[in-house]
């Protein structure tokens, strides 16, 4: 409603301005030229009215005669003359005798203000428009006219309700930050032994591990002013704005000291300085220089603690990482199985769970998941249960949600020919069988499916029994054999292969090359690393390439070893699938019948046992529900609402 009122007011002002301009420019309002009385009488008495200027008409208002002179050369002009009171009647008689039209006009007795307002209206309109324009610039969070002001948001305790009780799985990071909170609450406890509070804390870790959540917990626990800002809020298109915002941010911090300033994604402003297109005059470098000075420069900022977060510590400038600026570097790693169990318990506090839900089993089945992944898993499980009109979330919902998170959503509407479906079944059966036969050196098979998920026509999902922190050579070689299993199965069954193994070959080639050049797993090359990373400083080390620091002979040996690893894996997969051709056929047949096989069913097929019976869970889509509801309403309109049967 407020916006509509503003629009209506704007249209009213535009219409009034148009009327004022129209009145100002109308012929009646044009100013008349004052002339001498003799000139007026001469033009009144002109006889040759087709050649010389002559008077066409006269308007008499009080003692002022306004007359219109028609000049054949220059057109009509408006002139006026003021007559004395004694000879007004005689002059009027002369005008009438010369056959000039005479008009009498009453003296204007209207008030002064309406006319003044009409003349002042354009100026008022321009002032109002300028005021509205300035308010529009100042509106919102941008504040376009306050370029040099900091955009940091001061969070109050009422705005933030996250505490350390809501953080799980990263106990070491919590301990480090809780010590800083304790220092802020009781500084004398540490200062009596000569200790000082850390000036800065840098949280580093992969995306989704909980760095920003830790910062929100600090804001909820600190009991001191907490400023929050993103690294991208400093740099603008205008030169000097970033440095000005840094100064303003620390000025606010000094006024509210002791306080905490949190800079999220600090790599946006703290990237490595170096030679580039911008040189030393780059706006980002000016902002970084000002940030370095404010954090630990000539002037001290006692009581202002900087907490920053980044998932790219490798791109940060060394000057910002030194002690005195960031005294502590806290690595927020992926949680282990106990950490994942704790995160699951935090995120399921408000979710009604079924009696069959086991947090320990879920935690073991989600290796590599970070906090954001686990939160997404719980949310997907709750949504799946809601779509089935359940009252609680069961273990089946969590398993289906895990498959969706790991492998992508099912694309059951995708039309696949029987031939392609059969090829996909044998391809995935080859992966699964090789992985099962090499289970001593590889991760167990979690699920095999020929239902398209994401960009893939089928998937074989392997999950480790426990967190894997390193990789042996036997594991790497087994991984190569599993990757080759799909292509080899196509060769054995169909005598040819398809493009479906393209991604498998790419993964195998990358792994084999890393085994040779990085991990030292080749007996021929030895434990030597070849091809050091060449990092571009100006581009933020995003575009990296491996510099060739070896001879042509070594390059040929590397290529030969990569080829040998892959061909050996191909041969091993062929031998395993040839020796177990019958199991391969049973796996492919079961996939064509059931479309998806879990670990228990794969074990039963490989072990020669009968497949266990299962109840297929079909989640209705919203389009199916709408269609069913329409059919129900249509039937009710035709046959009427069915009455319940009488009880016997």
UniProtKB/Swiss-Prot annotation:
UniProt region (Disordered), positions on chain: 622-648
InterPro entries given in the database record: AAA+_ATPase, AAA_lid_3, ATPase_AAA_core, ATPase_AAA_CS, FtsH, P-loop_NTPase, Pept_M41_FtsH_extracell, Peptidase_M41
Enzyme class: hydrolase
Protein residues bound to Zn(2+): 427, 431, 504
Signal as UniProt keyword: no
Membrane-related topology note: Multi-pass membrane protein
GO molecular function, one term: ATP-dependent peptidase activity
Active-site annotation: 428
Keywords, alphabetical: ATP-binding, Cell inner membrane, Cell membrane, Hydrolase, Membrane, Metal-binding, Metalloprotease, Nucleotide-binding, Protease, Transmembrane, Transmembrane helix, Zinc
Positions of ATP binding: 205-212
Side of membrane Periplasmic, spans: 28-111
Topology, Cytoplasmic side: 1-6, 133-648
Summary of subunit composition and partner proteins: Homohexamer.
Family: In the central section; belongs to the AAA ATPase family.
Function: Acts as a processive, ATP-dependent zinc metallopeptidase for both cytoplasmic and membrane proteins. Plays a role in the quality control of integral membrane proteins.
Cross-referenced HAMAP family: FtsH (MF_01458)
Name of the protein in question: ATP-dependent zinc metalloprotease FtsH 4
Upper classification of the organism: Bacteria, Pseudomonadati, Myxococcota, Polyangia, Polyangiales
